[in-house]
UniProtKB/Swiss-Prot annotation:
This is GMP/IMP nucleotidase YrfG. GO terms for cellular component: cytosol. Optimum pH is between 6 and 7.5. The active site is at residue 9. The gene is yrfG. Keywords: Hydrolase, Magnesium, Manganese, Metal-binding.
Amino acid sequence: MHINIAWQDVDTVLLDMDGTLLDLAFDNYFWQKLVPETWGAKNGVTPQEAMEYMRQQYHDVQHTLNWYCLDYWSEQLGLDICAMTTEMGPRAVLREDTIPFLEALKASGKQRILLTNAHPHNLAVKLEHTGLDAHLDLLLSTHTFGYPKEDQRLWHAVAEATGLKAERTLFIDDSEAILDAAAQFGIRYCLGVTNPDSGIAEKQYQRHPSLNDYRRLIPSLM
């Protein structure tokens, strides 16, 4: 699907964090390997049994705020997920195209807002190790509002809190379900990321334009 952004009509760029500005390899390793292995070792079950259990646990709360909530998972699994996140912090890395794109947005006068479903502790750890916050104008965790990006109530709350105009906004995320929610709210431009995890094959989007390198956008932006 062709990317055709009329930049002169864009005031605000909303950006997801994990997989969009940061390499999703951190989260995929944490939630698909480290957490199941740690829970399995604690409970004396095989790695396969632990993974199957975790898959069901994840599925049960998919697209809800609990899916992203470290406190929920700590209580559910009997693990100190916040401490584990802190310990793994050095693994958090920026995508190669993140800083060039964010700086180009700044140079062109666009407002850069982080909108992440990440738990505040998760966000703080990643900011500490990446310095991402130095390249953004505003950082928002959906936990502050009580709804994830999949929920229309979140979009209304964010618009009210920031004053953004949906018809003059670009939103970039690596989840098609979340892009769908943004489009439903009225966000004019919704763009998917095909390579959120540098270690796995690119993904495809059915209903939204997508790309694998933000630097492709810079010439038209400038």
